[in-house]
Amino acid sequence: MGDLWVLLFSSLSLAAFHGVRGCLECDPKFTEDVRTLLGNLVPLEVPDRNQLLDRQHKEITHISSKVSHKDKMLRLLAVRNVIKLREWLKDEFYRLGNETWKGVFIIQGNLLEIRQNLEKKLTQIIKNFSEVACSEDCIVIEGPVLDCWNCLRMTTRCFKGDYCQDEDPKTAENREISLYLIFIAEAVILASAVLLFHVCISHRRKMKAIRRTLKTYLEKKLEELVEMIYKDDGEKNLEFGRSNSNSLTGEPTCAESEMQTGT
């Protein structure tokens, strides 16, 4: 039994190293080895053995497809990581093969636990690798890379576009809303500045016009006042000159003439 396990897993390792084209289900040799290993876990006398093996084989080999198609960012995986996962799965099958047969329900529970652990490990490994492969720094990836969607083996060192996750729609929407609000705020600030500038310029022009009008008005009034003063002074000087001339010639003034006439 032990020699058979060694032989089967040796062929499994060789299949992993030679001609690996994709994730777990991408290698036909791997899927056949899983079927053989499952058959060694279930005795021949178990009822509906073939249906049980087919169901377990399908669920195990399709885990990679199940994980990869959840998100397009989960489609890339390094070949070395695929080999590690297969080695881990090999160890789990080997552990179950060394245990005593305890019935169909027990083996199904054990296989379910293996599938759940395999799915968790595969999801985490793919996420970690994709974050590195799709990083903005474009970190160099060593070794071949597998596209789990179409089982292609690539040597690309940096990945963009279809191989990387799109931006979260909510994040993009929030960014658009933020940019729109920033644009509105800038427009309001700019409009307020223009309006304030216009008000200040208009107020300044109005004040200049008012000062100019007031200055003109005051100058005009001042000229009128000066003219009135000059006119009054001229009349007084004229009357004073007449009085002096009458007194010198002996002619009575108008007031004296009236007084004499009255007498």
Curated annotation (Swiss-Prot):
Magnesium as a keyword?
Answer: no
- Extracellular compartment ranges equal 23-176
Could you tell me where this protein is found in the cell?
A: Cell membrane; Cytoplasmic vesicle, Secretory vesicle, Acrosome inner membrane
Please summarize what the entry says happens upon disruption of the gene.
Male mice show impaired fertility and almost all of the spermatozoa show an aberrant acrosome shape.
Q: Kindly list the GO CC terms recorded for this protein.
A: inner acrosomal membrane; plasma membrane
Q: What tissues has this protein been observed in?
A: Sperm-specific (at protein level).
This one is known as Izumo sperm-egg fusion protein 3
**Molecular functions per Gene Ontology:** protein homodimerization activity
**Membrane topology listed for this record:** Single-pass type I membrane protein
Cytoplasmic side residue ranges read 198-263
Family from the record: Belongs to the Izumo family.
| Subunit structure and binding partners | Monomer and homodimer.
Q: Please tell me what else the database record remarks about this protein.
A: Izumo is the name of a Japanese shrine to marriage.
Segments of this protein annotated with the region Disordered = 241-263
What is the name of the gene encoding this protein?
Izumo3
Protein origin, superkingdom: Eukaryota
Main localization of the protein described in the UniProt heading: membrane
